[in-house]
Amino acid sequence: MTPKEINVIKRDGTKTPLDLDKVHRMVELACEGLAGVSESHVEVNSGLQFFDGIKTSDIQEILIRSANDLISLEAPNYQYVAARLLLFSLRKSVYGEHPDKHPHLRAHVDRCVEKGIYDIGIVNQYTLEEWDKLNSYIDHDRDYLFTYAGIRQVVDKYLVQDRSTGEIYETPQFMYMMVAATLFQDDDKFYRIEYVKKYYDAISKHRLNIPTPIMGGVRTPIRQFASCVLVDVDDTLDSIFSSDMAIGKYVAQRAGIGINAGRIRGINSKIRGGEVQHT
């Protein structure tokens, strides 16, 4: 069977003839400008065997694993090749178009709000002019600062997604901008755009780390602004049971938990006048 006789299944379910040149261009672009890497090594190491009906997403995943397997002390730059290949796949999945074609920030927000992914309150917090300005600040090329381990963690843990279907709704730079825009939405309107830009620059350039609950949930309907929560437990049954309920709710909101049980009486202390001994 020749390449022209092989059809691949695209992400939207349509079939198209296999284009080997397109596969090679993708690998070539992933290796561009990096020392000590080879497109042919990635392709050969993948052991990729094409068959009629193979999914384009599977082709990309095989190439990603191939580049990841080539990472070594002697060839560390394959970590960036694998990262780029993963980014190409991610962008194609999220945008549905060419990986370098990015939607406008406001269009992206409207789409995510409509799907119930982003908090509906964020839409009208900024004017159209402010959304335009925030969109102009986004530098999607900062995605290429990630190593493979870094971008894989972002994809698996922090990007907003439907974990039952695997559908991902945003890319790293949209995530960073929406975190910043959400955190400063209620600040003084004269200064907040500048604050958003500075914060976006700091987190998107990896100069500042964000706690997991905020990075993963602050822009969503969960509205998780707190990272770690301290729960004080008093020396009563009502307080102990209420604390258990609070802990459960905070954990469901992705918050980290700290418990202050210092008020609870010590071991062997009397309960109800000695009817029960505390253990």
Identify the function of each model-found stretch:
Residues M1-T279:
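Extended catalytic cores of very large enzyme megasubunits
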